[in-house]
Amino acid sequence: MPTINQLVRKGRQSETTKSKSPALQDCPQRRGVCTRVYTTTPKKPNSALRKVAKVRLTNGFEVISYIGGEGHNLQEHSVVLIRGGRVKDLPGVRYHMVRGSLDTQGVKDRKQARSKYGAKRAKAGK
């Protein structure tokens, strides 16, 4: 334990919190170009083919981003928007695609939670 004199001389050092999405550099979203679009398998108790993309951002970072929703139109050289948010069962995936912006289309026939998937409201007649 420090003495009063040591505290007067040095003071306490506050712990700095590390960013969970460093590639965004304190921005809400970042634009990037897909360099590879592929599927990968999740960690142990789960089983699926999760859609992910390797994206080169405008600030030079290269990150892996998750493509949420059923079906997508992304391929190499697609321009996409990335937001923070990890996928718990995919190691190294710390970002999500923003559906319905730039080259990423919204999810087709989506009825609920539409804003998260860039889906427009269905016509009243249908």
Curated annotation (Swiss-Prot):
What Gene3D superfamilies does the record tag this protein with? Nucleic acid-binding proteins
Q: Which UniProt keywords apply?
A: Methylation, Ribonucleoprotein, Ribosomal protein, RNA-binding, rRNA-binding, tRNA-binding
Entry's Gene Ontology molecular function annotations: rRNA binding; structural constituent of ribosome; tRNA binding
Top-level taxon of origin: Bacteria
Gene Ontology BP terms:
translation
Residue ranges with Basic residues bias? 113-126
Q: Which GO terms describe its cellular component?
A: small ribosomal subunit
Q: Where is the stretch described as Disordered?
A: 1-28, 103-126
Q: Which family does it belong to?
A: Belongs to the universal ribosomal protein uS12 family.
The UniProt function text for this chain reads: With S4 and S5 plays an important role in translational accuracy.
**What does the annotation say about its assembly with partners?**
Part of the 30S ribosomal subunit. Contacts proteins S8 and S17. May interact with IF1 in the 30S initiation complex.
- Protein name per UniProt: Small ribosomal subunit protein uS12
Give the organism's phylogenetic lineage: Bacteria, Pseudomonadati, Pseudomonadota, Betaproteobacteria, Burkholderiales
Name the gene behind this protein: rpsL
